[in-house]
Design a protein with these regions (language model features):
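Gram-positive cell-envelope targeting signals
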Residues: 1-39
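Cys-dependent protein tyrosine phosphatase-like superfamily
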Residues: 33-284, 297-399
């Protein structure tokens, strides 16, 4: 069967299953009745767009390639609620909790003219409880809906986050790691620069995500601190991307020697030393696009935590669904990812995630060691990071 036909057939089946599940959830919540003023409609518990879900649920390279080729700006959560318009309402408060008694609630204020709200930072595979309060312009509560529950998608663990004015934001948690461990949610976020962050974005950044440290992995020549955020410490720890983090002796002749910049190892070391201290967490790490340098440091972090290559690739390639453009592990030919591991190498950009990984394994796991061990060897022997620091990072970020 031709790869494209195979892809469409597989996706059609998955779409039918997802639609049937969504219908079942809808009927379970509402019993097939029209909404009343005390009821909410739950919107899209699958969390993300069809295009992102097609990629995350792809069964093989063919399906991944087809999903990546259809990628556009879909890096947003889409789960939300809607309600019937009410008279004399100045504002609504959406109240959300993971507890049935609504303890430890989060509140979101919505203008009285609105009839929908999309959540920003839900967790996958999590049951939530929600209600809506309406207020007049004197602050008097007019109505409160009953508490309703919903559960987010459970077929994947990746967590994309909406931060208004910032693109390509996601949690690096949720991935399985070696030793029956999982990377914790809510401690390390990656994304693009904060130049255009809005007040709503800042509220998500500080109140919902609770960011304590902003790590900027750009050098001062192409970036720097652009916004003062109360309670958030800023560190600039510049580095380069992909194979340029490896010493010249490891470089393939095709890319030429001299790409390695010794300052990079100082930046990488600084990142790990920051993550080793619990008081610095949660951390937001970024470059300009949140793609290349950020993708490289996240490869090192999740890799040394014990995430397998397939998970590292997914985290990297999800950038393709943001406004930052395509980021694939390699070029593609005849519906296959190419072994040289270079997607782009021209005057516009150098994108070589697969090449970086191959060289890492070649030089730092020469006797067939695991990817986790290869990155550990690199961090210790090239970057001068102590084993104590690495173990502290693991203790902080794994569960």
């Amino acid at each position: 069967m031709h790869p494209y036909v195979k892809y469409r057939y597989s996706m059609r089946i998955k779409k039918w299953i997802a639609s049937a599940l969504a219908l079942f959830i809808s009927m379970s919540v509402f019993g097939g009745c029209n909404l009343g003023k005390d009821e909410l409609q739950i919107l899209n518990t699958e969390m993300y767009s069809k295009e992102v879900r097609d990629y995350l649920l792809a069964a093989d390279d063919y399906e991944q390639i087809m999903a990546l080729q259809s990628a556009d700006i879909y890096d947003k959560q889409t789960t939300g609620i809607s309600w019937e318009k009410q008279e004399n309402v100045d504002k609504y408060t959406v109240v959300l909790s993971v507890n049935a008694d609504m303890s430890d609630e989060l509140q979101y204020v919505v203008d009285g003219a609105e009839t929908e709200y999309t959540f920003n930072a839900l967790m996958p595979n999590t049951k939530y409880y929600v209600k809506l309060q309406s207020y007049d312009n004197s602050g008097k509560m007019l109505r409160e809906t009953k508490v309703q529950s919903f559960k987010t998608q459970s077929d994947f663990s990746q967590r994309i986050v909406n931060v208004d004015g910032v693109s390509n934001v996601r949690d690096i948690g949720g991935y399985n790691a070696q030793g029956n461990s999982t990377v914790k949610y809510g401690l390390l976020y990656r994304g693009a620069r904060l130049n255009a962050i809005t007040d709503d974005g800042l509220a998500t950044f500080t109140q919902e995500l609770g960011i304590k440290t902003e790590l900027d992995v750009r050098y001062g020549t192409d970036g720097g601190k652009v916004v003062d955020i109360d309670g958030v410490a800023y560190q600039q720890l510049g580095m380069w991307a992909y194979s340029s983090i490896l010493p010249d002796t490891c470089q393939p002749k095709a890319t030429g020697a001299g790409l390695f910049d010794a300052r990079t190892i100082d930046g990488i070391k600084g990142v790990f030393e920051t993550l080793a201290e619990p008081e610095n967490l949660p951390v937001y790490i970024h470059c300009t696009a949140g793609a290349d340098r950020t993708g490289t440091i996240c490869y090192l972090i999740n890799g040394v935590l014990g995430v397998e290559y397939e998970g590292l690739v997914q985290d990297f390639e999800l950038t393709s669904f943001s406004e930052q453009g395509r980021r694939w592990r390699s070029s593609v030919k005849n519906w296959e990812f190419q072994s040289e591991g270079v997607m782009q190498n021209d005057e516009k950009n150098f994108i070589a995630f697969g090449q970086m990984h191959s060289l890492m394994m070649q030089w730092y796991a020469p006797n067939g060691e695991t990817l986790q061990k290869a990155i550990e060897n690199y961090l210790i022997n090239v970057c001068g990071i102590s084993m104590e620091t690495i173990e502290s990072v693991r203790e902080n970020l794994l569960v």
